[in-house]
């Protein structure tokens, strides 16, 4: 039997008898430990040898023997808990301790900086698993950030100013409006050791052609080593930014044959995935990264939904609960929570119904019904971006005839959506409208793969906003279902850099197709000893650029 299993058995005994010495029998102990009398005798011998207890046996069946505890079960439990924490076995820790509040405090005490075996380790607490890290698929906000740490594109978009920077390619040029050339760095390696080949780039980009944003790519070739040519059906001013977006990250061409690639992907980025399961994501600095090696050696993201649900709205937590004075940064998101009206729905495609719903469901009406801790993090939205005021207040018209029931759909693992849907239910019920709630996984929501009148979601944009605002929404199949046919004309104007984003956004809002609700305050909590931390528009920070000052500094 392993030491950990023996410790658990001892703790069960200690808890059963409250640490008090007692007279008992082998049969009674067998019932406590749910095993045979013979096995109990073996366990007692091992526990006695470890110095945890003294077992003074009396000969004969049914004879009462003396059980004397020499070690506190609490002390042993604490020792074992510390070992599990050190080994990042959070699931086993929850089973061992049992008390969720106690586990939470233990975890919070270990957040932030750790120094082990010569390595700098950053520990983060998060509220849900990060199970899909495959570029080119439906990625939520935090998955998008992680993918940027694991992969590279031909170009990179600077998170702070939106400027285009070299990445896998060191230079690029437009030979003609329909022909772009990228010059790649040599000797770039994937995390599994193989050198990047031009065929990896070609396969990574051609796999994206079926997607709306990439449908104008005609062909990708490599005329000579370390050169990639991209041919287009129509000109695209934004192509270099598009090839630096998270969808266009470069994968090894054999990615489909790699086991569980969406969860444990292989890239060329500054961090490689060591472990990714439902309770932990661990990434490690890649020593053969072609850029500057990351300064933090390892990032551990502990996932405990039942212990960290409030992180849905409070932000990324790198330190214990007493960090009010240690908040690193906060910002109002570039994006919003919103309602989309599905044009496939007979009710949602009716302008009068959409107008009436938007007049009823105002940000102020929702905030007035929200709990105080939500009010702290929500700011009323009157446009897609905080600086835009496109949603004009109008007088409430009478309810359209025949409107008695609506279906609202949102994605799971997001407690704020539950709160918003409850408020919407109350507002509509007061008007005689029943609201049916439908919850999907994120991929089905992203695809719009359900019948619904209204869709509840959120979008986070990044710099440059002229690129990301349209790109983020247009690449979403759900939006293709919900918006009018004009969207397909808008893509050409956007690619020509003639689409004015403020006007485009105002059109969607004024036509009651896209209804902004809130802008969210993003907050990053952590230690002031951390340096190089700049919160990005996704509420995270670039791991490879962060570092710790020595404790005495």
Swiss-Prot record:
Keywords: Activator, DNA-binding, Repressor, Transcription, Transcription regulation. Residues 163-494 are annotated as: Solute-binding. GO terms for molecular function: DNA binding; peptide transmembrane transporter activity. Residues 26-49 bind DNA. The keyword DNA-binding applies. Residues 1-113 form the HTH marR-type domain. CDD domains: PBP2_SgrR_like (cd08507). GO terms for biological process: negative regulation of DNA-templated transcription; peptide transport; positive regulation of DNA-templated transcription. It comes from the Bacteria. InterPro entries: SBP_5, SBP_5_dom, SgrR_HTH_N, Tscrpt_reg_SgrR, WH_DNA-bd_sf. The keyword DNA repair does not apply. NCBIfam families: PRK13626.1. Activates the small RNA gene sgrS under glucose-phosphate stress conditions as well as yfdZ. Represses its own transcription under both stress and non-stress conditions. Might act as a sensor of the intracellular accumulation of phosphoglucose by binding these molecules in its C-terminal solute-binding domain. This is HTH-type transcriptional regulator SgrR. The gene is sgrR.
């Amino acid at each position: 039997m392993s030491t950990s299993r023996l410790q658990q058995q001892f703790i069960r005994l200690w808890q059963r008898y409250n640490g008090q010495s007692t007279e008992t029998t082998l049969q009674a102990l067998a019932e406590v430990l749910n095993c045979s009398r013979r096995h109990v005798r073996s366990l007692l011998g091992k526990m006695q040898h470890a110095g945890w207890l003294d077992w003074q046996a009396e000969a004969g069946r049914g004879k009462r023997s003396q059980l004397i505890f020499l070690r506190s079960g609490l002390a042993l439990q604490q020792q074992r808990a510390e070992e599990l924490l050190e080994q990042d076995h959070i699931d086993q820790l929850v089973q061992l301790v049992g008390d969720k509040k106690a586990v939470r405090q233990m975890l919070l005490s270990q957040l932030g900086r750790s120094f082990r075996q010569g390595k700098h380790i950053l520990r983060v607490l998060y509220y849900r698993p990060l199970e899909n890290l495959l570029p080119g698929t439906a990625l939520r906000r935090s998955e998008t950030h992680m993918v940027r740490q694991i992969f590279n594109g031909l170009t990179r978009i600077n998170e702070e100013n939106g400027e285009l920077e070299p990445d896998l390619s060191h230079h690029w040029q437009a030979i003609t409006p329909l022909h772009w050339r990228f010059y790649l760095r040599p000797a770039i390696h994937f995390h599994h050791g193989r050198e990047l080949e031009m065929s990896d780039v070609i396969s990574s980009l051609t796999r994206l052609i079926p997607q709306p944003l990439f449908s104008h790519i005609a062909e990708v070739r490599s005329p000579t080593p370390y050169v990639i040519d991209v041919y287009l059906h129509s000109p695209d001013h934004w192509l270099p930014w598009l090839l630096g977006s998270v969808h266009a990250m470069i994968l090894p061409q054999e990615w489909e044959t790699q086991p569980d690639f969406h969860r444990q992907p292989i890239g060329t980025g500054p961090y490689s995935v060591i472990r990714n399961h439902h309770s932990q994501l661990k990434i490690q600095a890649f020593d053969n990264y072609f850029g500057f090696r990351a300064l933090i050696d390892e990032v551990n993201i502990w996932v405990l939904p039942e212990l960290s649900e409030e992180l849905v709205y409070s932000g990324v937590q790198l330190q214990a609960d007493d960090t009010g004075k240690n908040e690193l940064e906060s910002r109002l998101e570039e994006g919003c929570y919103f309602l989309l009206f599905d044009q496939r729905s007979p009710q949602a495609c009716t302008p009068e119904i959409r107008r009436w719903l938007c007049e009823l469901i105002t940000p102020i009406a929702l905030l007035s019904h929200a709990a105080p801790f939500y009010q702290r993090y929500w700011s009323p939205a009157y446009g897609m971006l905080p600086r835009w005021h496109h949603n004009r207040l109008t007088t409430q018209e009478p309810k359209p005839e025949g409107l008695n029931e609506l279906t609202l759909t949102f994605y799971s693992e997001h407690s704020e959506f539950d709160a918003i849907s409850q408020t919407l239910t109350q507002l509509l019920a007061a008007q005689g409208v029943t609201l049916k709630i439908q919850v999907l996984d994120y991929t089905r929501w992203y695809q719009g793969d359900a019948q619904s009148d209204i869709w509840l979601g959120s979008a986070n944009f990044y710099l440059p906003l002229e690129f990301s605002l349209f790109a983020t929404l247009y690449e979403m199949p759900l939006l293709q279902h919900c918006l009018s046919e004009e969207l397909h004309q808008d893509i050409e104007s956007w690619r020509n850099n003639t689409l004015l984003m403020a006007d485009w956004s105002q059109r969607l809002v004024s036509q009651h197709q896209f209804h902004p609700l809130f802008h969210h305050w993003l907050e990053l909590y952590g230690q002031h000893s951390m340096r190089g931390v700049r919160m990005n528009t996704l509420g995270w920070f670039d791991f490879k650029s962060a570092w710790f000052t020595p404790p005495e500094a």
